[in-house]
Amino acid sequence: MKLAKLFILSLVMIAGFSGCEKKDPTALHEVHWDRDMCVRCKMVVSERHHAVQVINVENGRSYMFDDIGCTILWFHEEKIEWAPKAKIWITDVDTGKWIDARTAFYDTMNITPMAYGFAAHESKESIKEGEEVVDFEEMSKRIFEIEAKNNRKAY
């Protein structure tokens, strides 16, 4: 009887300690397609080939976006101080796989949820020949140009 109690106590302790495992603060959070809303424009995130998830690595909080344009503008509009350290995940337009947005390659002629037109690719090779390819920095710069041209807010 004493051995059985000791065994049960051991199982409870093992279960308790396994719940204390430290999680990766940059890891993707579960996405609730067609229910999560874009933090900036409040549209429902349903397009699985243009979605963006930003992780604040300081506290592990996740933010969903329907278009990379909303992400870039949100960082600026909300004056997000932790933006340089943020982990930015974006879905590859061809595979739907989550990739690092800062190292992705972007083509510029896509129909995207908010019409910014940038689609992410894990490699340059997956972009059709003849299409313009830009990196994260150039794409970000162009988002502000598009926004300034199309909207009255000046960036």
Which residue stretches match the model-derived regions?
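Post-signal-peptide N-terminal segment of Sec-exported extracytoplasmic proteins
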Residues: D36-I72
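Mature extracytoplasmic domains of secretory-pathway proteins
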Residues: S62-T108
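C-terminal motif of bacterial Sec signal peptides marking the signal peptidase cleavage site
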Residues: G16-G19
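Short, flexible, mixed-charge glycine/proline-rich loop motifs
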Residues: A27-W33
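Bacterial N-terminal signal peptides that target proteins for export
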Residues: M1-F7
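Beta-strand-rich cores of mature extracytoplasmic or soluble domains
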Residues: I88-Y155
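Bacterial lipoprotein signal-peptidase II cleavage site
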Residues: E21-A27
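Sec/Tat-exported extracytoplasmic proteins
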Residues: K42-V45, F75-W82, I143, E147
